[in-house]
Swiss-Prot record:
One of its GO terms (molecular function) is oxygen carrier activity. This is Giant hemoglobin AIV chain. It comes from the Eukaryota. Giant hemoglobin is composed of four heme-containing chains (AI to AIV), and two linker chains (AV and AVI). Belongs to the globin family. The keyword Metal-binding applies. Keywords: Heme, Iron, Metal-binding, Oxygen transport, Transport.
Length: 32
């Protein structure tokens, strides 16, 4: 997660990473 360069290599994890990113995004923007 967080490493765009690894996205193509670990594309099968994109959904898991997206879930983590969205949770972090919600935490940052949802609290502001």
């Amino acid at each position: 997660s967080g490493n765009v360069a690894e996205a193509p290599k670990h594309y099968h994890c994109s959904y898991e990473d997206a879930d983590i990113v969205m949770r972090e995004w919600y935490h940052v923007w949802g609290s502001g």
